Amino acid sequence: MNTPHIIPRVGIATDAHQVQPGKDCWMACLLWEDQDGCEGHSDGDVVAHAVVDALLSAAGLGDLGSFVGVGRQEYDNVSGERLLRECRELLESKGFVIGNAAVQMVGNRPKMGTRREEAEKVMGELIGAPVSVSATTTDHMGFTGRGEGVAAVATAVVWQAQN
């Protein structure tokens, strides 16, 4: 009798977008009032995008660009929420179970600490697994420190049964 082995897989990813004055700020699947959002083909949610990329990386399924592309009209201004939901559906269809994800936003704004638990809850429900959210600044160094953009770094763990 062949007993299946559970093989954990780890993925890592980054995302960065330039701040776009006047655009709605979506970060960690939350709308941040009175904050400028990030440019992009999508809603500019670097936190959600980094988690999607880390999940795809862990499963060996490419990256966000290969997942949705930038030329597909149905993904114009797509939300991070939709990307996380569709990524979860893809992974589950390929036999993967999401273990957890961790993501750190790098930038001056929005101030993630005030809504960190809310972000973890929303994103965790979308992927069906715990999500840890944190944030840091770069002490005024680089494009994130000057407020020109926001970045995020994420890791994710998934499992797939192997015979």
UniProtKB/Swiss-Prot annotation:
InterPro entries: MECDP_synthase (IPR003526), MECDP_synthase_CS (IPR020555), MECDP_synthase_sf (IPR036571). It is an enzyme of class 4 (lyase). The keyword Oxidoreductase does not apply. Keywords: Isoprene biosynthesis, Lyase, Metal-binding. The keyword Glycosyltransferase does not apply. 4-CDP-2-C-methyl-D-erythritol 2-phosphate binds at residues 15-17, 41-42, 63-65, 136-139, 143, 146. It comes from the Bacteria. Its cofactor is a divalent metal cation. Pathway: Isoprenoid biosynthesis; isopentenyl diphosphate biosynthesis via DXP pathway; isopentenyl diphosphate from 1-deoxy-D-xylulose 5-phosphate: step 4/6. Binds 1 divalent metal cation per subunit. GO terms for biological process: isopentenyl diphosphate biosynthetic process, methylerythritol 4-phosphate pathway; terpenoid biosynthetic process. Its EC number is 4.6.1.12. The record marks 41, 137 as: Transition state stabilizer. It catalyses: 4-CDP-2-C-methyl-D-erythritol 2-phosphate = 2-C-methyl-D-erythritol 2,4-cyclic diphosphate + CMP. One of its GO terms (molecular function) is 2-C-methyl-D-erythritol 2,4-cyclodiphosphate synthase activity. Belongs to the IspF family. Involved in the biosynthesis of isopentenyl diphosphate (IPP) and dimethylallyl diphosphate (DMAPP), two major building blocks of isoprenoid compounds. Catalyzes the conversion of 4-diphosphocytidyl-2-C-methyl-D-erythritol 2-phosphate (CDP-ME2P) to 2-C-methyl-D-erythritol 2,4-cyclodiphosphate (ME-CPP) with a corresponding release of cytidine 5-monophosphate (CMP). Homotrimer. This is 2-C-methyl-D-erythritol 2,4-cyclodiphosphate synthase. The gene is ispF.
